[in-house]
Amino acid sequence: VKGLSIFYIFIALLMFGLLNQQHLYLNIIAIILALLVLVGLFKIEQKQNNPFLPTNEFNRSIMLAFITDLFIAMSLIGYNLYIPVYLQEQLGLSPLQSGFVILPLSVAWIILNFNLAKIEANFTRKALYISAFTVLLICSVIILFGMKVPLLIAFSVIFAGLSFGYVYTKNSVIVQEESSPRNMKKMMSFYALTKNLGSSVGSTIMGYM
């Protein structure tokens, strides 16, 4: 009960930090407090026999999965939300046309999922993660300087989709494989929450921009 209560305090502070639109300094303070509460939650749960948050499951690989998923979710909301809006409002494309521009991202994601086992057989996990984030960074730079060329955007999001697809899929597999059967459902729930928080943070950033 204590861990759950602290967790709700963390969520409340985080949501206030993301949603408040009155004073920016209040957002910053709330987010800092949320992070401090989260650290406190980990320390408290480590001392519990039956913890709400299974801290013993957070090994290096799972921590990496949670952190990368948070940032990937923040980035993905920019692709899915900002690019279509920009294409419609700034370039005058119809909703259907802007949808077709961003469609290759989803297609590439699906294709990668069907071929992930073959890819992993030839490369290490570290190499694939570094490649995925490098490709995503390059795609973002290309889109940044080619925002007035829809065909270039459509071409770039193909490779972005491959990056998003690998990181999302592999992170999910890591959490499932490296969590104990007893706590796997809890860990997958926290994993899903992390993705949702990343999307919320990304949406907030887009809103401020």
Q: What is each of the regions a protein language model found here?
A:
Residues 1-68:
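Hydrophobic transmembrane-helix bundles of small-molecule transporters
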Residues 51-209:
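12-transmembrane solute porter fold
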